[in-house]
Design a protein with these regions (language model features):
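Domain-level signature for soluble enzymes in the chorismate/prephenate branch of the shikimate pathway
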Residues: 1-120
Length: 120
């Protein structure tokens, strides 16, 4: 059996899409976080790990850089993944009416310029 490629899951995330782009035939192994990806690779539970290293919107991904510094890991490939965010609501709503936005911290950081311009 081919060893899996670990990525911080769950399926459907941007890292899952990056893993599929880099390793289209899989298998893919969703794990609980960035450190779990490094642990899986170092324990040989995964052949490779896929982690974000930079965002054109939010800059360097510090946790990935920390893991590369702390552990015996090397970058052996890369892919560029276009990311689009959507601001959605339960019903019709004007941007001026938006009061609270809930999302993953990375997505909030990537959208900080738009969020700062919201009037509410």
């Amino acid at each position: 059996m081919t060893p899996p490629v670990a990525y911080p899951g769950p399926p459907g995330t941007h890292t899952a899409a990056a893993a599929a782009a880099l390793f289209p035939s899989g298998p893919h192994l969703p794990v609980t976080g960035f450190r779990a990806v490094a642990d899986a690779v170092l324990a040989a539970d995964a052949a490779f790990g896929v982690l974000p290293i930079e965002s054109s919107l939010a800059g360097s991904v510090a946790e990935t850089h920390d893991l590369l510094y702390e552990r015996s890991l090397s970058i052996v490939g890369e892919t560029i993944l276009p990311v689009t965010h959507c601001l959605v609501a339960a019903g019709p709503l004007e941007l001026a009416e938006v009061r609270t936005v809930h999302s993953h911290p990375a997505a909030l950081e990537q959208c900080r310029d738009l969020l700062a311009r919201l009037p509410g």
